Amino acid sequence: MDHKIDLLQPALEAALAGKIQALVRDRGELTLTVTAADYLAVCTTLRDHAELKLEQLIDLCGLDYSSYKDGAGSPYTEGPRYCVVLHLLSVSKNWRLRLKVFCADDGLPVVPSVNEIWAAANWFEREAFDLYGIVFEGHADLRRILTDYGFIGHPFRKDFPTTGHVEMRYDAEQRRVIYQPVTIEPREITPRIIREDNYGGLH
């Protein structure tokens, strides 16, 4: 696959001159990072350019980099918190690309929707909105897809409580499911490692 990357990398550099924030080659894969302002134009070029032809969106997801701020030596200790990651495939040229775009505002993370470029983005963008609160501007039907309509918050954010905000139970008197405050007390869980001789057949 390295010979494919040898062809894809210069093609990206030529087609996206001035719009590449970072282009990293690692473990036989290319990761392209662009700004939110260039995101739509770059996606259109990636799909339509004769030398790139990344016609298929395989996956799109959100990321919350807030916990990286505590990690030493990470490239994500500074900068935006939320990121959208796309995995693209060229069926005609048989190569793949990872595309990353960071949301400019941590308070209200917004990036343009690519649903008009790749129709497969529709439910992926709804999922990232539901789980991370990332708003995809221009999406025709941006509503929750995994949690219920009354859900409070976005459960994949690093600051979302593991117990949640409310719990549901069936009330026999009302004969329906009701919401109530969480009855589990928050606690700190410390993992314990128990080492035993000959554990797992190891000596």
UniProtKB/Swiss-Prot annotation:
A Pfam family it matches: Complex1_30kDa
A GO cellular-component term linked to this record: plasma membrane
Major localization listed first in the record, in broad terms: membrane
Subcellular location: Cell inner membrane
Membrane topology type: Peripheral membrane protein
InterPro entries tied to this protein: NADH_DH_suC, NADH_quin_OxRdtase_su_C/D-like, NADH_UbQ_OxRdtase_30kDa_su, NADH_UbQ_OxRdtase_CS
EC number in record: 7.1.1.-
The entry's keywords: Cell inner membrane, Cell membrane, Membrane, NAD, Quinone, Translocase, Transport, Ubiquinone
Catalytic activity: a quinone + NADH + 5 H(+)(in) = a quinol + NAD(+) + 4 H(+)(out)
SUPFAM superfamilies: Nqo5-like (SSF143243)
Molecular-function annotations in GO: NADH dehydrogenase (ubiquinone) activity; NADH:ubiquinone reductase (non-electrogenic) activity; quinone binding
HAMAP family attached to this UniProt entry: NDH1_NuoC
Protein task: NDH-1 shuttles electrons from NADH, via FMN and iron-sulfur (Fe-S) centers, to quinones in the respiratory chain. The immediate electron acceptor for the enzyme in this species is believed to be ubiquinone. Couples the redox reaction to proton translocation (for every two electrons transferred, four hydrogen ions are translocated across the cytoplasmic membrane), and thus conserves the redox energy in a proton gradient.
Family stated for the protein in its record: Belongs to the complex I 30 kDa subunit family.
Quaternary structure, from the entry: NDH-1 is composed of 14 different subunits. Subunits NuoB, C, D, E, F, and G constitute the peripheral sector of the complex.
PANTHER family: NADH DEHYDROGENASE [UBIQUINONE] IRON-SULFUR PROTEIN 3, MITOCHONDRIAL, NADH DEHYDROGENASE UBIQUINONE IRON-SULFUR PROTEIN 3
Protein's name according to its UniProt entry: NADH-quinone oxidoreductase subunit C
Species annotation: Methylibium petroleiphilum (strain ATCC BAA-1232 / LMG 22953 / PM1)
Phylogenetic lineage: Bacteria, Pseudomonadati, Pseudomonadota, Betaproteobacteria, Burkholderiales
